[in-house]
Swiss-Prot record:
It comes from the Eukaryota. The gene is MCPA. Binds 1 zinc ion per subunit. One of its GO terms (cellular component) is extracellular region. It is an enzyme of class 3 (hydrolase). It is found in: Secreted. Extracellular metalloprotease that contributes to pathogenicity. This is Metallocarboxypeptidase A. SUPFAM superfamilies: Protease propeptides/inhibitors, Zn-dependent exopeptidases. InterPro entries: M14A-like_propep, M14A_act_pep, Peptidase_M14. Its cofactor is Zn(2+).
Length: 422
């Protein structure tokens, strides 16, 4: 099985911010094959034999295989899966990407307006939007250049506070886009920030949340990878930091945190999408984020950390590294996860599954949630996989942004109200 990284190597052999031609996915299909006891090994063999990329790899029976099939392999692939059930996620992946990347031109007038959320946007427009949004609420927020990526891009953050003033309350930290291709997380974390700012003193629940917590929103944790998905390869996942093997740049930043770093939930292969890095915490962006989280924790601690991902419609708790270990706060984590999922579903009927990371999605080593809980002693550490469950996957149409934001806000508000109640 190739990683999505290998497609980028066909497009460009680069490890810097050089501009290259985008990889062309025209004619590629994304096909879901549900696995069962009698076919999971065969599906794994097909993926290996045809050297196919996957969005979801079936490690065991009952898991879906979401498979990227190039035009040259369509006939062979369809022959091999004959008799198995399948679902077409993208008939033409190139066309889906083209539709998704029709960015609307940014205007500063979008800052207080929901129109910003009708389209995806370029990295630089996100920076402009965050600065303009903060400029409308100067007494209750600040725009922060939280540090620089490996290629020198700003890692942006919005800091939001209420009646007590900044740095006066326990912190809530939201992370988005640690995996570059998960564009919906950029927009949803910005939707949360926009709502918390614009609805303060208008919505009683939001006002209470902002008054009770110092809120930090990091919409683009991995700016180099994010920019690369917009210029070169839409399906890039990792950062853009060089490795000893120059053909395979990048670390999976969510396998690079220095806690339970080695294990089956990450890879030592630089060409893997889950490459953990050469050393724990050696990712440029991870160093920046650890420093920021430690600084934030030094004020009044961190009440909650949420790392937003896509896709799968899941809301999950520790641990990623172990499928048997549970933190002492497991019951509280599960309770809040259920509250989040129930409130979210009430908005548009979107179902979310909940549970510990390892048991709910797969085993993960060196991830942000386990690190935040065990090393930084964050009280509550959680992660989400946003829309959808695979109908469109990573290439989620722009008309899904606003409903995703609406339901995620509802879940988040309900969960934080429960935290305030104790």
């Amino acid at each position: 099985m190739r990683s999505v990284l290998s497609l980028a190597l066909l497009a460009a052999n680069v490890v810097t911010a050089a501009v290259v031609s985008p990889f062309d996915y025209s004619g590629y299909k994304v096909i879901r094959v549900p696995t069962q006891k009698d076919n999971v090994k065969e599906v794994q063999r097909i993926i290996t034999d045809l050297n196919l990329d996957t969005w979801k790899y079936p490690k065991s029976e009952g898991q879906n295989a979401d498979i990227v099939v190039p035009p040259s392999q369509i006939t062979s692939f369809m022959e091999r899966i004959s008799g198995m059930s399948m679902e077409m996620m993208h008939e033409d992946l190139g066309m889906s990407i083209s539709n998704e990347t029709s960015f609307e031109a940014y205007s500063a007038g979008y800052a207080p307006d929901i129109n910003w959320f009708k389209s995806y946007h370029s990295y630089q427009d996100h920076i402009s939007y965050l600065q303009d949004l903060q400029g409308l609420f100067r007494t209750r927020s600040e725009y922060v250049d939280a540090g620089k990526s490996h290629e020198g891009r700003t890692i942006p953050a919005l800091h939001i506070w209420g009646s007590g003033g900044k740095n006066s309350k326990p912190a809530i930290i939201f992370h988005g886009t640690i995996h570059a291709r998960e564009w919906i997380t950029t927009m949803v974390t910005e939707y949360l920030a926009w709502s918390l700012l614009s609805q303060y003193n208008k919505n009683a629940d939001i006002t209470s949340i902002v008054d009770n917590f110092d809120i930090w929103v990091f919409p683009i944790v991995n700016p180099d990878g994010f920019a690369f998905t917009q210029t070169s390869n839409r399906l890039w996942r990792k950062n853009r930091q060089p490795n000893p093997n120059a053909r395979c740049p990048g670390r999976d930043l969510n396998r690079n945190y220095p806690y339970q770093w080695v294990g089956p939930g990450s890879s030592s292969n630089p060409c893997s999408d889950t490459y953990r890095g050469a050393q724990p915490g050696d990712g440029t962006e991870i160093k920046v984020h650890i420093a920021n989280m430690k600084r934030i924790a030094s004020y009044h601690g961190i009440a909650m950390f949420v790392d937003w991902h896509s896709y799968g419609q899941l809301f999950m708790s520790p641990y990623g590294y172990s499928c048997t270990a549970r933190p002492p706060t497991d019951a509280r984590h599960q309770e809040l996860s259920r509250i989040f999922a129930q409130a979210l579903r009430a908005v548009h009927g979107t179902p979310y599954r909940t549970g510990p990371i390892c048991n709910t999605i797969y085993q993960v080593n060196g991830d942000s949630v386990d690190y935040a809980l065990e090393v930084l002693k964050v009280k509550l550490s959680l992660t989400a996989e946003l829309r959808d469950t695979g109908a469109r996957g990573f290439v989620l149409p722009a008309d899904q942004i606003i409903p995703s934001g609406e339901e995620t806000l509802a879940g988040t508000v309900a969960m934080l109200k429960a935290v305030i109640r104790g």
